[in-house]
Amino acid sequence: MELSTLGLKDRAQWEAKGYQLPQFDRAAVTEATRENPCWIHFGAGNIFRAFQANVMQNILNRGEMETGLIVAEGFDYEIIEKMNRPHDDYSILVTLKADGSVEKTVVGSVVESCILDSENEGEYGRLKEIFCKQSLQMVSFTITEKGYSLVNGKGELLPAVAADFAAGPEKPASYIGKVASLLYTRFKNGQLPIAMVSMDNCSHNGDKLYAAIHTFAEKWAENGLAEKEFVSYVNDREKVSFPWSMIDKITPRPDASVEEILKKDEIDGLDPVVTSKNTYVAPFVNAEECEYLVIEDWFPNGRPELEKGGIMFTDRATVDKVEKMKVCTCLNPLHTALAVFGCLLGYTKISDEMKDAELRKMVERIGYTEGLPVVVDPGILDPKEFIDTVLNVRIPNPFMPDTPQRIATDTSQKLAIRFGETVKNYLASKDKDIKNLKLIPLVFAGWLRYLMAVDDNGEKFELSPDPLLETVCPVVAGIKFGDTDVEEMIRPLLTNRAIFGVDLYEAGLAGLTVQYFKELIAGAGAVRATIKKYV
């Protein structure tokens, strides 16, 4: 069996092995999309293949749309060359269910793939043609948060960006420069309206995309390389929109155990490819069943009816509330708590931690008892139901190969948002008492204990990458098991608003955090004993 147009001609063979196949006339959809494209997506990675492409397939299967998806890749051209095109833009989605079963779907809603290469006249010419079409309603992105950045870590312009500012929209080299150039083509073709929709997992993502595109428009206009009207076009809400969105679906990299399932089905050409840019790609993608995509309903040229596929459309304030609900209460804090204590207790799978009665009780109390009373309720999603799904379906899913070590990455950058906002909400509330927070301070103390890089058995372990390690690790470097006179040593961290979002002394949580920390460093086995004592 081969994943291609030819290989899928024998539908019965695929269906006999349990595959759900496209139920629409793909040739007709391909032709309609080529003539009148509606939606192009930048970023041909796993989240797109597992989520947006499958949503579109379900809508096409029901005959509720006539056009499919076009995908463009601008970071790693080999994804298109080595994965999309050899398989005629088909891919296999393996949905990993919490009960241990899998669902296998051949996704065929992507009917054209493009390479975002301004040096390649054929590829770039086709993208310009797409951007000139009146029918185009939505340009979406999953290019990661750093994909929108025009500067390096020191705040200096990236060389490709600086060169593009000077050279203009003709043949840009940077990713956002190319996107801005394509938007300029649309501007030149009658100032046609369009929605530019970031679907990356970062707060206020539409603003990040706008800031990047707007900067290019301004620089080109300043340098006489584009009309001033192009800046006005980018700023005109009736012509170009940059909606906010919130996305949530875990799509780990293609897993060997999933590959084995598909190999048993005798599908050829499944081997993953590591590209020269170190992207790990395969003809299949594995993902959890749960998915959420909430988009601000701001589409100057109309939009596809993606609500028919489960995507939610609402106003900006509600998108913001959904984001805060997820990041500050209902998912991310629970993940971080499990990550910190999982590393200390020697776990290598997040799902295994949910079989640990004490760790489970800890995150249940952080979510339901401490977080929910001050949660931001967005209205379109129920926060309690969201936590229920996180704790009973998503995190315990044994098929999701997620690790506490991965989630512990950059914890110093996460504590202020994931826990500090809840602390601030308690402090601001007239009827909530900060003294009711018992387990959030335990996570704070747990992170300080984690920084010692010694697990609960007294064995050294490697800390996950974090930009502040060089600053924070020396604070705990002199602390040993059994020390009790530690408060003054850790005070610089407890007062650090950048880390915790508040000064823990001013918030009234420092005393409890210090007490917990002393108990956590009492000796080998103290981490387990402390969790047991307080949950």
Task: List each model region and its residues.
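Substrate/ligand-engaging "lid" and interaction regions
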Residues: 1-42, 46-535
